[in-house]
Structure formats: C-alpha cells, structure tokens
Regions:
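NAD(P)-dependent Rossmann-like dehydrogenase/reductase catalytic/cofactor-binding core
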Residues: 2-11, 34-36, 181-188, 215, ...
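Rossmann-like NAD(P)-binding element
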Residues: 46-50, 61-121, 129
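Rossmann-like dinucleotide-binding cores of NAD(P)H-dependent redox enzymes
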Residues: 40-73, 163-168, 186, 195-201
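NAD(P)+-binding Rossmann beta1-loop-alpha1 motif at the extreme N-terminus of oxidoreductases
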Residues: 2-65
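Structural/interface elements that position substrates and couple domains in central-metabolism enzymes
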Residues: 202-208
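Rossmann-fold dinucleotide-binding core
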Residues: 121-199
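Structural motif
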Residues: 18, 41, 82, 97, ...
Length: 330
C-alpha cells in the first residue's frame, strides 16, 4: 500500500466492514460515498436484505441533501454484503464493528487475518477497549489501529485514529490522510488511553450531569437545557481550548482553583443511570430512558436527529477547523 500524502485513489482501496449493524452499515455508506469498493460482512447470520435497505435509505437521504450526485444504484453497485470471510481477501483496509467483547473481537480478528494481505490495515471501532489490549489478539500489531466513529458516520466530521503501543505511526498518519476523503476532520491519538479523547471528555460530563440530578441541584430537563444552550451553542466552531482562548484563559484559571475539587469524582456507575438500565431501559429504542417516549415520539426523535445531522454538517463545513486561516488567505 502506498503511504504517501499525494492524491489517493479511493476506488482502488477496497474496504471491509465486519459487523453491519447500525454503526457498521453507516460506515459502509460513508465508504461508498468516498468512492471505495466496500465489502460488508455479517459475522453472525443477519437479514442481509434489511442491511442493504438501511444503506440504500442512507444513500437516498445523502442524495436528497446534495452530499452525493450519482443515483443510489451507482454506489450499491460497489457494495457486496456477505457472511463469508474469504470475500475480505482483496481489502486494503478492514474496520471491525462487532460487540464490545474481547473474546468475540479476538475470534473475528483471527478470521480476518487468515484472508487479508499482510500489508492491509486492520482497525477496530471499539469505544472502550484499549487498542494495545486488542493488539494482543492479532498477528501483526503494527498494522492495527482504533478507528472510532460516531453515527451517522456519513454525515459526522468526527473520527479518532488511535495508536496502540505497537502501531506503526506512519500507517496511522496514512489513515488520517485517507479519512479526509471520508469528509472527516480526524483526531490522531498518539498514545493509547481507555476511552480515547472524545469519550473521556464526554463521560466526565455524563458523570457530573447524573450527579447534579441525583443531588437535586437540577432536573434532567434543566441539565439538558444548559448543555444545549451553552456548549451546544459554540462547540461546533471551537473546541474547549479555543473556547477558553476566545473567552479569556485567565477567567478559567481563576475558577479552576475552587471548582475542580468540588466536581464529582465517584468511580462507581451513577445510581440515576444504573436504575434505568436495571429496569430494562434502553432510551429511545424501547421508550424508557431518562425520559419516556411513546412510539411516535421515539420515531420523531430519531427522524429529527437524522435531520439535524445534515443541518449541523452544513454548518461544520462552513466553519472548518482552519476557517480563520482561510479568511486570512482570501
């Protein structure tokens, strides 16, 4: 595989996606839009026609939003859905999207490595398992990385490329270059750490949010309202460090001395979410989460989130990370 920062011909780079549930199928859509031939593999028997319909619907929506211009069938012609690992043989890149279970992933890696070339890159979409730990399950740890996506994969600008202790950095840099063809602003995580970057930031917020509700400081609705109208207002333009620069670093320095010791640092799962899960709650999926949902409300929330993802994508593209550099050049 050519490891250069020149123009990359995505149509010559076959991509395998192993595990084609909601996330895996969304990644398939992203790769098809980027021009890759895609092999979507179901490691356990599934209704492949249902998966194809999901990808087809994603492509239809992408076309309506102007993300793609070719007919949906043009992209589907570059997609193979299968349950046969041997079909992964021509892939230069494989993305594993199976359950967050080390034993399951280890078995999947053995089957993948039995058929792909030695110079093919193998990645995992894990959001919780350290990449270095997963590298212990593969024959060629140097070519193994984390690729942490968010859903919808074909509209979000987010992607983390994570090195394990044994990853070859040059291959990670190549993945970051390739990710730009997927319409990503990739984050390169140089050192392996549990949760990577985005999850560590977000789970600190989730813990504090649960604490504020459990201790009676605010309701679920009010915590959500504060997030939507504060961080939700600026975070697409500026990350946390840029925001502190914009609004005065010295102010945050002054507040940290007194506030940081007062923040919740309990390592146990918050009672608020624990009670919901023990009662069978899954959120919108079954109508029972921090809020309750009728079937129609659940459907409309999912529909609205998808609609919002297209709108926020347009805003993110208008204000990319280098927006000021572009203005200086104009």
């Amino acid at each position: 595989m050519i490891m250069e920062k020149a123009v990359i011909d995505t149509d010559k780079i076959g991509v395998g996606v192993v595990g084609i549930g909601l996330m895996g199928s969304s990644i398939c859509t992203c790769m098809l839009i980027a021009g890759h031939p895609v092999i979507g593999l179901a490691p356990i028997p599934v209704d492949l026609e249902a998966v194809k319909l999901r990808i087809c619907n994603d492509l239809d929506e992408a076309r309506r939003e102007g993300i793609i211009t070719q007919p949906t069938q043009y992209y589907l012609d570059h997609l193979l859905l299968t349950e046969n690992y041997e079909d992964l043989a021509p892939c230069s890149l494989v993305v594993e999207c199976t359950l967050e279970d080390l034993n399951i992933k280890s078995g999947v890696y053995q089957k993948i490595e039995a058929v792909i070339a030695e110079d093919a890159i193998l990645t995992s979409n894990t959001s919780a398992i350290p990449i270095t730990l997963l590298q212990q399950s593969v024959k060629h740890p140097g070519r193994f990385f984390g690729l942490h996506w968010t859903i919808p994969a074909f509209t979000s600008r987010f992607l983390e490329v994570i090195c394990g202790d044994h990853s070859e950095v040059s291959k990670g840099e190549y993945l970051c270059e390739l990710a730009k063809y997927w319409s990503k602003e990739p984050t390169f995580v140089h050192k392996d750490i549990r949760g990577f970057i985005a999850n560590r930031l977000m789970y600190a917020m989730y813990r504090e949010a649960c604490h504020l509700v459990e201790e009676g400081y605010a309701s679920v609705e009010d915590v959500d309202r504060a997030c939507r109208n504060n961080t939700g207002y600026w975070m697409t333009l500026a990350g946390v460090f840029r925001w502190m620069d914009l609004t005065g670093v010295q102010a945050y320095h002054a507040v940290m001395k007194d506030l940081l010791p007062d923040l919740n640092a309990d390592p146990s799962i918050p009672t608020l979410i624990d009670d919901i899960v023990k009662a069978g709650g899954k959120g919108v999926a079954n109508g029972h989460g921090f809020y309750t949902y009728t079937p129609e409300e659940a459907r409309l929330w999912e529909e609205t989130y998808k609609e919002f993802s297209f709108e926020i994508r347009k805003l993110a593209l208008k204000y990319p990370a280098d927006v000021v550099k572009r203005k200086l050049k104009s």
